[in-house]
């Protein structure tokens, strides 16, 4: 699986992983609005050997398959998020 990673310009240390470059159609409108402009930062192959600095590759692959995106937020923010966003 391949991922394209974008950085939020409004939310510090917040990134969105999507399976197709520049395709944000799977992101809910309120989330997309709250993130503001998204700046492309990386494309990455999420194979079994891939390690990511701040995210679990299995969770990234799972969310991208099931939801169409993966949202990476700073640990301090993640602890405050409702359970259904895990």
Swiss-Prot record:
Superkingdom of origin: Bacteria
InterPro entries: YcgL-like_sf (IPR038068), YcgL_dom (IPR027354)
PROSITE patterns hit by this protein: YCGL (PS51648)
Domain YcgL: 1-85
The protein, known as: YcgL domain-containing protein Smlt4554
Native species: Stenotrophomonas maltophilia (strain K279a)
């Amino acid at each position: 699986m391949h991922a394209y990673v974008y950085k939020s310009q409004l939310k510090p240390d917040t990134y969105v992983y999507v399976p197709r470059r520049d395709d944000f159609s799977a992101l809910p409108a309120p989330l997309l609005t709250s993130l503001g402009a998204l700046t492309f930062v990386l494309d990455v192959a999420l194979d079994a050997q891939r390690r990511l600095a701040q995210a679990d590759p299995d969770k990234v692959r799972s969310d991208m398959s099931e939801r169409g995106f993966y949202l990476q937020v700073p640990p301090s923010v993640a602890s405050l998020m409702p359970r259904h966003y895990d």
